[in-house]
Amino acid sequence: MKMKLTSLLLKFPEIKLKSFPSGKNPDSIEIEYIQSDSRKTNKNDIFCVADSIGSKKKEFISNAKASLILLRTDSNVLNDLLEVMNSSKIFLECEIDPEQLQGRIASFLLGHPSKDLDIVAVTGTNGKTSLTNILFSLAKDQGINCGLIGTIGVKFGDRVIDTGYTTPDASSLNLILKEMKEEGITTVFMEASSHGLKLGRMNGISVRAGVFTNLTQDHLDFHSDMEDYFESKFRLFEILDFSKSTFAVLDYSAPNGSKLYHKILNRFPDLLIYALDDIYRKWKISDISLNLQGTSYVLGLPGNQERKISTNLLGSFNVRNTALAFLTGIGIGLDLEKMSNSLEKIPQIPGRFQIIYSKDRSRMAVVDYAHTPDALENIIRSVRDSQPKCLITLFGCGGDRDRTKRPKMARIAEELSDQVILTSDNPRTEKPETILDEIQTGFSSGFIPLLREVDRAKAIVEGISCLPEGGCLLVAGKGHEEYQIIGKEKRHFSDVEEVQKAFGLF
């Protein structure tokens, strides 16, 4: 909906009018929307100039069609811009990073679409995509019109949209939620990344439930340290909409699970918490059985009840994912028996423990998104549970990202695999050979990888050719991705396709 500039300034007193073209009346200015991408702006929009834009502020403001510009109060930057910019621009200022206000403004301009939706947001280092996809399947099977927002894209109705982000920017996110509401969606399962939470992309979103999977090392190129990373994840529980039947779900036994549990309890003592394997043992997992046909376990329920859970999803980590999904389903009112039945036939989640067999099924490959030390360890151990005669782990590490995890992942691969192949992930602007050098520092003295090949396609072919009968090649790091970033170029690349070609499947 359109709004007068004066009305917006009254609604958001933290925004001040810095510069206004002479001859115009502020009350005559109508605002349609707010965008942080200058290319998406229209004349009556606000261009939100995020701090992260850095030195390109002038360039992006010049290219923006928006007549209103919102940026952080900084007299030097503002005065410099006012001297060189077209005087027809209206400059607004605030004391904080404008990106922190963007979500609240976007939600307000669209009539708060999230208020009419049950939004379940999942955060954690690993498991977000799997868990949201499992929840989407469980709810859909019970006739709920639901939507999905995450790493693999946005899904609702017959629509699938690739946003390129785990958590879209605040303006895009609110537009997506508005479309979902208009399409009759009632429940949304979304991934809440630490980047998205710290940058305020979910500010202004009405979240009913927050789910936490785990917290292990990742993104230390973005977060100053693990405590900053933890606090960014905790932010999800600070933005819960307590006007709804709000609740939290977490894995108490997961890394940083107990820490989060007690912090939530201290800050929000009245918040309902479903804690898997908590200190009161209300939701305890036992009798786990793992094989290539599926996974089963017993989930303890309050009142000394138990429920046998069986699922086609593979790997010990999917024990935790499905159990967390079950608890979340209880929170949103799903039928227990129907959930149990649905878990037996969850659709394959792209790039998550995705098995590809050779034509004669004598060898296999597993494609998985694991790109953190914890995720790599979990997937290798899960593949080990299938007892392959030989396990070769192929992986690399992303360029321009947290470098400290590189030797740690090498150590894990060496200790848990029979052979290791080093290759490129998304090298971005780093030299691929330099990345591999840094990974190799984590190997023990004298350990030599089976192969070191920066060309990922060639590495996969070589890995498949080295597999003995009964062997398995784990291709870790990219999972569902259908691209590879080399330099600043994004090229088509799919681990699944490369494995299929190497097996001669097409």
Swiss-Prot record:
A motif (Meso-diaminopimelate recognition motif) lies at residues 425-428. Carboxylation is probably crucial for Mg(2+) binding and, consequently, for the gamma-phosphate positioning of ATP. Its EC number is 6.3.2.13. It catalyses: UDP-N-acetyl-alpha-D-muramoyl-L-alanyl-D-glutamate + meso-2,6-diaminopimelate + ATP = UDP-N-acetyl-alpha-D-muramoyl-L-alanyl-gamma-D-glutamyl-meso-2,6-diaminopimelate + ADP + phosphate + H(+). Keywords: ATP-binding, Cell cycle, Cell division, Cell shape, Cell wall biogenesis/degradation, Cytoplasm, Ligase, Magnesium, Nucleotide-binding, Peptidoglycan synthesis. Pathway: Cell wall biogenesis; peptidoglycan biosynthesis. GO terms for biological process: cell division; cell wall organization; peptidoglycan biosynthetic process; regulation of cell shape. One of its GO terms (cellular component) is cytoplasm. Coiled coil: none annotated. GO terms for molecular function: ATP binding; magnesium ion binding; UDP-N-acetylmuramoylalanyl-D-glutamate-2,6-diaminopimelate ligase activity. ATP binds at G124, T125, N126, G127, K128, T129, S130. It is found in: Cytoplasm. Its cofactor is Mg(2+). It holds the Pfam family Mur_ligase_C. Meso-2,6-diaminopimelate binds at R401, D425, N426, P427, R428, G477, E481. InterPro entries: Mur-like_cat_sf, Mur_ligase_C, Mur_ligase_C_dom_sf, Mur_ligase_cen, UDP-N-AcMur-Glu-dNH2Pim_ligase. UDP-N-acetyl-alpha-D-muramoyl-L-alanyl-D-glutamate binds at S38, T166, T167, S193, R201. The modification N6-carboxylysine is found at K233. Belongs to the MurCDEF family. MurE subfamily. Catalyzes the addition of meso-diaminopimelic acid to the nucleotide precursor UDP-N-acetylmuramoyl-L-alanyl-D-glutamate (UMAG) in the biosynthesis of bacterial cell-wall peptidoglycan. This is UDP-N-acetylmuramoyl-L-alanyl-D-glutamate--2,6-diaminopimelate ligase. It comes from Leptospira interrogans serogroup Icterohaemorrhagiae serovar copenhageni (strain Fiocruz L1-130).
